Each structure stands twice: as structure tokens, then as C-alpha cells.
């Protein structure tokens, strides 16, 4: 009986610890730690014939909110063409933001990226060229930077 109790305890303690760590990670992932920056970067996501997917629209809405709070004077939208070569994720983002009141001159489009890694590299080059030192990156919990 003692042995069963020890085995149960040996399994329960790590499980409780793991659940606690997972809860803390989940809690921290919802905290918005944005500080005033030179630019807001919106990572691309799917677009459907010129319309942002729900994921992209959520990112754009958050970028718009940050912009209206004056967290940065510029927004950089990223992402190239997917299945439809007429539209790019970055271009769709620009259109969405201008329709929602962001002046076109405040938006920079990186429309070549076919991956997050490519877009981040391209944005780094844009920021260096424009002497932008800091950025707020808008993404969702499932994207990895």
C-alpha cells in the first residue's frame, strides 16, 4: 500500500507542477507589453481575394488600435502573394488599414515574404534603411517569431 502511495505521489507532483507552469505560460501569453516604438509590424497571414483572413484581420485590428493609441507613427505590413498573385498579404493589410483611417504614408508594405523568416529579414532591412530602431510585433499566440 505504501508503494502505491509513493508511486501516485511521484506521478502527481510533476503533473501538478507541469499544470502550474502551463497555466503561467498561458497567462503571460495574453499580456500586452507594448511600449512606444518607431513602427508596428503586422506579420502576414492568409488573404482571400483581397480580403484579410480572420487571423490577419485580428492582427490588423490590433495594429490599428496600437496606432490610434499613438504607440508608433508607422505600420509595416508583411507577406507576399499566396495562391492568388493579384494580392499580397502586405498589400491587403495596407488596404484594410487605410479603409480604417490610417494615412497611406504611415504604412510601409513588405509584400515579398513567403515565410515569417523572410518577412522579418526584409523588415529588418527596411528598418535599417529608414533608421527605425524599435518595433512592436503584432502576431497571434500560435505564430512563432
Specify the residue positions occupied by each region the protein language model found.
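N-terminal type II signal-anchor transmembrane helix
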Residues: 1-32
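A structural signal for short, hydrophobic/glycine-enriched beta-strand patches
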Residues: 21-145
Amino acid at each position: 500500500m505504501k508503494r502505491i502511495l509513493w508511486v501516485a505521489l511521484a506521478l502527481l507532483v510533476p503533473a501538478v507542477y507541469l499544470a502550474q507552469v502551463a497555466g503561467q505560460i498561458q497567462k503571460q501569453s495574453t499580456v500586452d507589453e507594448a511600449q512606444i516604438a518607431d513602427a508596428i509590424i503586422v506579420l502576414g497571414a492568409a488573404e482571400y481575394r483581397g480580403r484579410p483572413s480572420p487571423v490577419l484581420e485580428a492582427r490588423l485590428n490590433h495594429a490599428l488600435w496600437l496606432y490610434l493609441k499613438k504607440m508608433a507613427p508607422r505600420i509595416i505590413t508583411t507577406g507576399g502573394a499566396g495562391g492568388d498573385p493579384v494580392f499580397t498579404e502586405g498589400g491587403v493589410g495596407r488596404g484594410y488599414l487605410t479603409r480604417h483611417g490610417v494615412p497611406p504614408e504611415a504604412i510601409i508594405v513588405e509584400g515579398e515574404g513567403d515565410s515569417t523568416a523572410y518577412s522579418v529579414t526584409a523588415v529588418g532591412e527596411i528598418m535599417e534603411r529608414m533608421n527605425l530602431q524599435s518595433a512592436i510585433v503584432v502576431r497571434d499566440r500560435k505564430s512563432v517569431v
